[in-house]
Amino acid sequence: MDNAIFPNKFKAALAAHQVQIGCWCALANPISTEVLGLAGFDWLVLDAEHAPNDVTTLIPQLMALKGSSSAQVVRVPTNEPIIIKRMLDIGFYNFLVPFVETAEQAAQAVASTRYPPEGIRGVSVSHRGNMFGTVPDYFAQSNKNISILVQIESQTGVDNVEAIAATEGVDGVFVGPSDLAAALGHLGNASHPEVQRAIQHIFASAKKHGKPSGILAPVEADARRYLEWGATFVAVGSDLGVFRSATQKLADAFKK
């Protein structure tokens, strides 16, 4: 049995600034997540912030993705070490941390994923993340194979984005367009010019410090524009959005 889980190919792809197209898993269901895992996306976000997920619902989804080539990214509900530790222990290696506003908060997120002395991650010798103690050199390899993506979604985050991007251990900077729009006074209008300028600034700041940038963009024209602006990892839709759109289209086709 091959118990090798490293190296982290998604982390390596981000470091090489290779475009990674992703999708959001918001339905919190292993079957819908398994279907997305068959589609060929480079990465999938299993959302534990806005979707009804916790460790008990995420484990079946990770199992459903076992044969998938898509990298699994978890968006944690908050930047708390104990939450991140539990996500590590169930098998996540890629983290999207919401509402990061300072370099100190970014550094805390990184430290939460690292074993001492580089960080503060608690040690369990046997858990799902290390295949219950069967992964060779897990403790030696883990720290350098965890990826941290920090989410900028406030004016304070925009103001501090250069320091955040420069933080050691941060692998990428992600824009939360809806919350950013709300924070800038344009709730429900991420297309507002002020929001778009802020997004460009975030992308440019990440690039300045050699870090890839990402964003959620379920509208194709938006996604393509952000890729042209230099975004590296772009989530182009969600299972919920695709399901809602397709079912409405099907119903409309027969009820009109």
UniProtKB/Swiss-Prot annotation:
One of its GO terms (cellular component) is cytoplasm. The record marks R75 as: Transition state stabilizer. Binds 1 Mg(2+) ion per subunit. Pathway: Carbohydrate acid metabolism; galactarate degradation; D-glycerate from galactarate: step 2/3. Coiled coil: none annotated. The active site is at H50. Keywords: Lyase, Magnesium, Metal-binding. One of its GO terms (biological process) is galactarate catabolic process. This is 5-keto-4-deoxy-D-glucarate aldolase.
